[in-house]
Structures are given as C-alpha cells and as structure tokens.
Amino acid sequence: MNKALQAALGTALTAAFVLFAILAEPAYADVLLTDLVLGTSAQERGVAIEEMPDILATHAIIMRPDGSVYYEREADSPIKIASTTKVMTALVALDHCDPSETLTVDHAAATVGESCVGLKEGDTLTLEQALTGLMVMSGNDVATAIATHVGGKIDPASADPYGTFIKAMNDRTAQLGCTDTLFENPHGLDFGAWVGNLHSTAHDVTRIWAEAWRNEAFRSFACSGATEMHVTSADGSARSLPLTVRNKILGRDGNLGGKTGSTYEAGECFVCTFSREPEGEVHIALFGSKGDEGRFNDTLTLANWYYGHFANLPFATSPKQVGGVPLAAEAACVDWSDKLMDLTFADADAAARVFTLGGTIEQKVEVDELRGKHAAGTAAGSVTYTQNGETIGSVELTTANELEPPNLLEWLAVQLDRLVRLFEDKPATAEERIYATMPDPLSIDEWNA
C-alpha cells in the first residue's frame, strides 16, 4: 500500500472515529437549564441536565389545579396562541348560555375559512353541538357562530354582537388575573385578514384552561372523542358532519382532554390535562413545537417528567438493623455509664410522597435520654423530615428492648466508673448514636429509572 493511500485511509478512519464519538454522546439540544423548576432555574437549583425534559416547544408550562407551577419555559413571554384561543371562546359561551340553546350560522361564520367543520349559511345547531365541533375539530366556523350568538345574549341591544363577545373574552381574561393576553377574534387565526395583536402567554392560557376545566360541561367537550356533529340545514333537513379528533393522545397515558392549535407564527400548540395516580390532575401547555407528532411527543415528555419526579420517600432507612428492622439510633441510658438503648422506627413503612426536584430534603433526629424502667416499644424520640424548610413527615422512635435501672450494687459500680471517667475526661454516660439516613430522592423516582 503506497503512502498516499495509507494517509487517506488514516484520515478516513480518524474522521469516522470522531463522528462515532459525537453520535455516541447523548443529545440535549432541546434541554435548557434556564428552564424553571418551581420558579427557579434548573441551573441555580443544581439540577443535572439529564433530569430536565427534552422538548422542541419554545414555550411550555406545567401547572397544578391549585395554580402552583412546577415547570416553565418562557411561560410569561407574549406569543401567538392559535386555536387554543377557543378555550376562552367555550368558557365565555358557557358563562352566558345553556348548551341546549339553538344558534344560526351567518355568512361570516360560514366563510371564515381554514379549519372548519363544514357549516353553511342558514344552518342551525345547538350550542352543545357547536362546542363539540369547536373543541374536537377546532372549527373556526363554529367559533364565529358561537361568538355572534353569545354576544347577542350578553347585550341584546348591541349592533355588534361579535364585538360584544370579544370584549367579554377580554373581560374574563382580566377576571382571571391574566397578565399579558389580548383576544381579537374567537378562533385564534393570526394571518391574512386576521393579522393583529392577538396574543397571550403559556401561563395565561393555562390559567384560562384551568378555569374552564372546573366547568363540568366544558370538560365533557374537551374530553370528547365524538366523530360527528349534527346540524339542521336552512331547508330544514338534518345533516351530520364528520369530525376529526385533533387530540391524538386523548385517553393515552392519562390524557383526559385538551385543545390543539396551529399557525405558522404560533407553531404547534396544545393545552391539556393529565391524571395519573397518586398525584392526580395536572395541566400542561406548550407552544412553538415542531410538527403534529412533535407537539404530542413534547406533551407526553412533560407529563412523564412531572409524574416521573414524584416518589415515595421511605423514612425508615439505616445502614444497620436490629431484630430484622432498621436501627434508627442508640439512646443514652442516663442511669448507667456505658449502656445504650437501640431505637427503631415505630412505623417501618412510613414514607412521604415528594417531588424529587423540589429542593433539599433534610432529617432532624431527636433522641430522648432514658432513665428508670422502660418497656420495649416505649416512645423515645422522633425523626422529622423537611423539604425546603417545610415539614413533609415524621416518624416516632421506640425502644427495641426493655430497660431496667441498676440495682444497688450496679449503682455503686456505675458511680465508681463515673469517678474514673471524670479523671479520664470522659462523659459520665454513653453518647447517643444516630444511624437514620436520608436516601437520595433522585435514586428512587422513575424519571431515569
């Protein structure tokens, strides 16, 4: 083999090796340590990159029904929100109208364009059917028809019922404490004739979703997998319209329901609710994802991240055992100079459900000094567990054996021993020992199991 060929082969092998090394490294291109966990950046918390979700979405949030936020990515930045706008459309409609009411489709609704269920001018349908088409298939035509009908109910004297409805959307937004949201239409279109300043934030959209989710009627539409809706044509004939379920993870891995959205500026959007035991429900919203599959993959990643970072933290942990149970501590028996009493956990199964990225978990062991007679199982201390300074649980410590005080001869021997200890500068009684330990929470959660 000539030298030129050898050199070329060597260069090729080196390049292949480097490429293999690069590909072998885990890719975290969409994992950001600037993302917030419980309001603090992952970097400030010292959270390892592998503990964070890898998502394509540019804006995202995970929020509990009580409003506590567990994860944020640019959640308070103003963005286009596409058809997640329709969550507020449904909420305002249910605030002011009964689902059994009948509405009529006008020319504006029938010709709005883009994602539509196929309504025609003059069609009539119940608000219930309209809300089904709104939440299941994201119909812009039903959104417009709803706005005109409900606006007329809000202010029968208004010459612009559509505008009245938009004002009601923004008034409701203010009531919910949203910080940066403006609605300009009931469907979320943001291009062509609809170019404007309609915007919100991931946080605000989730606030709106959480409020709507409290409404039982809204949940029935948001959770619906209906494949058709029913209308009456202008000539009085009944007509069924096929529906495509936009939420492709409905019923999967705990997804109870949601609302999709998509425009060029907003990207792929989704706001939804999951429920998995024992944590229960949580709301998730994301915006600016890539492609329909990417949107739902991101959503499932966030759900798995949230639920995967909860774990049962066992309290009764120790490197030592006595009688087959964990040894928590040894307590000083003050009537004796050299005796210690084994203390075990009163409830060996005691545990607390914790969010493993929620901050430092600490234990405080308090051991009583024992004097006199004690039966086995006597309370003799406790271990209290805190996370970020808040108590998450405690467990009582009890004596593993009986304790008898010294008789007269034993007492004299103890006094003599203490005299010797005094000259040797040793303590008059044996010193307590602590064996209870705190497991690393991240070692027991399911995120990277």
Report residues per predicted region:
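Hydrophobic alpha-helical membrane context
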Residues: 15-18, 98, 310
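Sec-dependent N-terminal signal peptides of Gram-positive bacterial secreted proteins and lipoproteins
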Residues: 2-26
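Catalytic-site microenvironment of enzymes
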Residues: 22, 70, 449
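Active-site-adjacent loops and short helices of periplasmic peptidoglycan-processing enzymes
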Residues: 29-216
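Domain-terminus/edge residues, biased toward the C-terminal soluble/receptor-binding domains
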Residues: 196-449
